[in-house]
Structure formats: structure tokens, C-alpha cells
Amino acid sequence: LGNLGFMHPLRSSGKRLLASLATGVFALSATNAAPAQPPSGTNQTWTTQQDHRNMMEQLGITKLRPGRNGSANATNNPANYDPAKANPFPNLPELLVTKDGRKVTTAEMWWKVRRPEIVEDFEREVIGRVPKNVPKVTWAITNEARDRAVTNIPVYARQLVGKVDNSAFPSIEVNIQMTVVTPLHAKQPVPLLMMFGGFGGGGFPRRPDEPEPTNRFRGFGNLTFADPPSTEQLIAAGWGYATISPNSIQADNGAGLTKGIIGLVNKGQPRKPEDWGSLRAWAWGAARGLDYLETDPTVNAKKVGIEGVSRYGKAALVTLAFEPRFAVALVASSGEGGAKLHRRNFGEAVENLTGSGEYHWMAGNFIKYGAAESKFGSRNAGDLPVDAHQLIALCAPRPTFISYGIPEKGDANWLDQQGSYMATVAAGPAFRLLGARNLGVTEDYRTAQKPPVNTGLLDGELAWRQHDGGHESRSNMKHFIAWANKLIRYTTPAPTNP
């Protein structure tokens, strides 16, 4: 599962968390305090644990509750998988009630009052703020080919680098890696799905005379799927695709927070509590990729979607919520920090995201909600001013497809498919308010039960489908394409002979 973006709680939280499990808390003491910060103009180099402790010190936190242990036989702080114990905070933050108690009854009130309130809470407490001084990105094609094919369909493929201006702090370089592939003989600009992550060679297709690799994942044998790769399904449907490398934007660890785009903007210094985390940085990078696509004559930039699986599913949801130019999203197996309700006690918990293994995804302030002891006392998921249903609602009225697989194939209960379904249901009123369609089921998230596997709720702009595959999105890709085509008003062209 690690190869697919799923990080086991014990592995993800590292040695520090393993030690803390024995006592039930993460303790900050004089012996493990963060080192002094370097002079301004010097690039800070810390370990993940040192950076994590520094943020705890900034927030005045002395002890954190440990993350849950997702192992089936765990005896130390095991994750809960009992539905009867899953809802300690049954009431979610109000979606359509303003902070001063007014009901939101019009689209204008949503856009001018309630939505900005929700955005502010997410930026301050959960995912962080994009700085105003982020430098510009200049894109250049480094490799291109018109002699490639995807499932025997000729394509135009190009690899690009988006160089971020680092003139203000030359010691940090950020070069965003992206591959763009579109049908070579398309008669008009095509819709395109941008996908976080890479596919072998970064999504760059083979020449027709090159053999297909027989083993996509080393050490796992020849994996078989019921469906072709997502890239093949997209090209066959007349779409284009792009793959964008998250790690070329921002590293997926706490030690990288003084590097990458976050470190560049901060000139090598550690984050402040409201600064952005990796999820927001990856979303920013996707938006810069869209900047390029708006200049590409083969792409219909009004019909560009965003996709991701696992942590990149979280990033895809954040991207659609905060970048209005994206038209649609496929949010796959996103779990805690994505479509899963923070307030659910099932599988992964807020405390896993506040530990040293995953805190870098979030704003520093998010760590407060795992605090056992601090200058402000203790806080938990029930103290968060927002929850996942509101993050999904920020995508409205644009088409938003929430996707999961099944535990038997590797999409573990750890992800809490039911809790994610409840969040999707609870987001429905915002879609309806804005003239879009919800899931077409009850909007009472407290009693909502997810439909059977392979039963899609795909009639509206808000969609849900749990496929019978694993920790991936390809098993839902054909359903996503058919659903998206209707909503963006695109018809797959008939095959043509060039």
C-alpha cells in the first residue's frame, strides 16, 4: 500500500510516535526541544522531528495524543472499527448558517458571506494560507514527441518544467515536473484530466514499437486489473491527460518544509502556524500547471479536471475547493484530511495528522487539535471550526466525484468509506443552493448509509461510487468519464483514420 500512497499509521509516524505509544502521549521536553533557528538568509536544515517540535513550541503544546494504530491486531492505541463507537461528535458544523446565526438562503449569501467564512477557517486552522508573495512560474517544454501512441491512438506528448523564480532566495530551486498528452489528430481542443503523481515514466507514452512493461511495481509481481490504466481510458475517450509531480513542488515530509515552494517563499526559515502545508502547496502547483494548459491550443482549458488518490486525493479535493478554474474533480480514497469526517472515530484520526508523520500536509495550527496538554488546554476533532463536508461544499457547484475501493482489495477500512459518504451527503445542500444536484438521497448525514459496492450515485454534480477494486481510481475511471462528459457537455469523438 505504501507504493500506492497509503501510509500505515505506525510507519507514517516514525520512531517518535512508536515511543510515544508506550506512554500514550507525545511529550515535548527540554531534552528534545527544537534547535535554535539560524540567522535570516540562511537555509534551515532540520529533521522532521525537529521541525515538528518547533511548531509545537510555537503553539505552546507540551503533549500530543498519539495517532491511532491501524494494525488488525493492535493492542496499543488501536484504531476503532466499531460503527457503534464511530460518532462521538454526531453534530457537524453548520454548512448553511453564518457565524452570526443567519440561515443562508440564496446563492449570493453563500458567495459573499458563508463561503468566505468557511474558507477563512480552513486557511487559518486546517490547510494554511498561500502567501501573497509566491514567485511566478515559467514553463518550458523539455521533451516532446508526435510518434507515440496510447492504445494505438497517436498522441502528442510533451514533458515540461515549470521553473519557479528564485531570484529572492537562490539557494532553493523549485522546478515543477509535468507531462501533457493529448490525442494527435483531435479536431478541436480536448478536455483534460490532470493527475497528481506519475505513471512509470511520468506518464510519457511509449512509441508504438516499444514493448509494454510487464511489471509496473517492482516486488509485487505482474499486477492485473479489470480495467485499463486511467491514461489509456482517457485517451480512448478523446480526453487528454497530464501528470504532475507533487514532490517537485513540495516534499512529502516535514524535513522538506524549509525547502520546496514553502521553503522558497519563507527563504529557508521554518513555517509559522498559519503557513500552508504540502496539500495546499500541491494544489498551488496544480494551478500553475493549469496556467500552462490555458496557453496550450490542444487543450480546452475550460474543461480541465483534477484527480488524485490517497494523499493526492486529499490534494485533489483541496485543489478543486480553492482553484475555481478547475472544472471537475475525481477524489479517490482520500480518507482523513480529505473526504472523511474529522469528527468520525473510525480508522485514521486527527491525531495521526497532527503527529510527525503527516503534520506537514496541514497548517501548523492543525496540530492544536491533537493537543493533550498546552497553554490553551487540550483540543480534539470536535473543536475544529470546520469539517470535511464543508471542504466538499467549497467545490460546489462544479462536478465533484468521490471515489473509494473496498478493503478486501486494499482500500482499507482505515480510510472510513462510510464517514466519507456521510460528508458527501452533508455537502449536498450547498450544491442544491447553487442550482446543482446532490447525491439524490437523504440529506440526513446522521442516518445515511453508503450504497452497495458498484452502485453509483451519478445523476448529479455531486457524485459517489465505491468500486470493487483497491487503493486506486482506475476502476472508477470509465464511470467518471461518462459522468463528466454529460456535465461538461463533451461527446467522445468517433475513431478516425488520419
Language-model features: locations:
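Mobile cap/lid helix-loop segments that gate and shape the active-site cleft of serine hydrolases
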Residues: 219, 261, 265, 269, ...
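Cap/lid segment of the alpha/beta-hydrolase catalytic domain
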Residues: 190-298, 335-345
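Conserved strand-to-loop "acid loop" that flanks and positions the catalytic carboxylate
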Residues: 396-416, 467-469
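Alpha/beta-hydrolase fold nucleophile elbow
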Residues: 298-310
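Glycine-rich nucleophile elbow surrounding the catalytic serine of serine-hydrolase chemistry
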Residues: 308-320
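C-terminal catalytic histidine-bearing segment of alpha/beta-hydrolase fold enzymes
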Residues: 361, 407-408, 422-498
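N-terminal cap/lid segment of alpha/beta-hydrolase-fold proteins
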Residues: 107-108, 112-116, 127-191, 201
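N-terminal pre-domain segments of enzymes
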Residues: 34-129, 492-498
